[in-house]
A protein has these predicted regions:
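Acidic, surface-exposed loops and disordered segments
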Residues: 1-238
């Protein structure tokens, strides 16, 4: 089903969504979802919100593919096989070892908190692989948004546009009591996903967003990461 066939028959009224401040402060990366799918009418509302994201010169370069149902289950099986075989086909390189200084510390702190919540010790390689592979079951989310983009120059500005679109998408989910998680790991299999979905080669996969109704009992949702004080990242010039 293509999105132009989805018509919203009952939009969420403004008083049914969180305030802006509540939305910003309650949004989190959800790593465990209930298996009941989000109605297509609500998915359309979220997509319409995301369409208002800013972009360089109003290019609106995002190309979003929503995958669910049997199609998503088929893709999950393929990605698990590819992951186990180490057959990665990313459009953009990514290596966590490139992080340094405070960025590395924050990355490591997240990993430690997550694996502890999942009751997996650092030396448990099999357990860590199993937990990492949950990315390719989409944390049990019944639907996933794959965010593709055209390639222009060094792609930095286009990727920035996609990031703003993704953030708007995530905030719209949060405002409705839904959850999502942006997954760089899905981009590791860009060519595989592109071929499976029939996406043209000129569109590059930056990341995907698994989303749905949060499962608050899931171990991956039992921890929270803090934010550094504003003064550590902002300089005022007066």
């Amino acid at each position: 089903m293509t999105m132009n066939l989805i018509h919203s028959s009952a939009e969420t009224s403004p008083d049914e969504t969180l305030s802006f401040r509540e939305t910003i402060r309650t949004r989190r990366s959800v790593r465990g979802f209930l298996d009941n799918p989000v109605p297509l009418s609500i998915i359309r509302e979220v997509l319409e919100d995301a369409q208002y994201a800013p972009s360089n010169c109003n290019t609106q370069p995002w190309n979003t593919h929503i995958v669910r149902g049997e199609k998503l289950r088929q893709l999950s099986r393929i990605l698990h096989v590819k992951n186990d075989a180490g057959e990665f086909t990313p459009d953009f390189t990514f290596d966590q070892n490139d992080y340094y200084g405070e960025y590395r510390k924050r990355n490591d702190a997240l990993g430690k908190a997550y694996y502890e919540a999942m009751n997996v010790m650092r030396e448990d390689k099999e357990g860590r692989h199993r937990v990492g592979a949950m990315n390719y079951s989409f944390f049990n989310a019944p639907q996933v948004a794959f965010l593709f983009m055209p390639s222009f120059g060094d792609n930095v500005r286009v990727a920035g546009d996609i990031g703003m679109y993704g953030q708007t998408f995530l905030l719209s989910l949060a405002a409705r009591g839904l959850g999502g998680i942006p997954q760089t790991s899905l981009g590791f299999f860009a060519q595989t996903i592109r071929e499976f979905l029939g996406v043209p080669d000129e569109l590059k996969l930056l990341f995907g967003i698994s989303f749905g109704y949060p499962d608050e009992a899931a171990p991956g949702n039992r921890f929270r990461m803090d934010r550094v004080p504003v003064d550590t990242s902002v300089t005022l010039h007066d």
